[in-house]
Amino acid sequence: MKQPKFAAAQFSGNDQYTAEEKARFANHFVRFVETGFKPTVFPDWFYRRLSCTFGHIAHFDRNGFYEAWFSTTRRRRDFLQRCLTHPFYMGAPFSDAEDACRQWVRKSGLVAKLGVQVALEVETKERAELARLQAKYEKEAA
């Protein structure tokens, strides 16, 4: 098993969350992202906490949230971009854990990497459509 990236000592406990809970969340956040946003690494406890961070609001259920943010490469890239750009309010009960995740996303370079992947997926799809249309209209012209 990989070494956790975050330790409880990095976080402050408060009346809503312990430092251990924050470390557990931050480490699971990294694991979820590093495993390619696999649904099997998206348990209910993580959904409930994640859906209330980075300006998200809870969706109807875990599956709806997953579909909205992790079902395509573009959505995964947009999710990580939101982690970086959503206004940050230090002092909120979970803000130190959010900031740790935000810093990890920034250092990982994943937004740019996923952006390249999105561009390649779009190009592949567009080239396939171009080939289909050329074949269709070349037949008609012949």
Give each language-model segment a name.
Residues 14-17, 21-25, 38, 72-75, ...:
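Non-membrane alpha-helical secondary structure
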Residues 110-121:
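Charged/polar low-complexity intrinsically disordered segments, enriched in acidic residues
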Residues 120-142:
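Short acidic, low-complexity intrinsically disordered linear motifs used
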Residues 1, 60-63, 133-136:
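Short, flexible beta-strand-to-coil junctions
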Residues 4-5, 19-20, 99-107, 111, ...:
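Basic, mixed-charge low-complexity alpha-helical segments
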Residues 11, 34-37, 42, 55, ...:
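Intrinsic disorder/low-complexity segments in short proteins, especially the signal peptide
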Residues 1-34:
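Short, extreme N-terminal segment that most often corresponds to the first beta-strand
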Residues 37-108:
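Acidic, low-complexity, intrinsically disordered interaction modules
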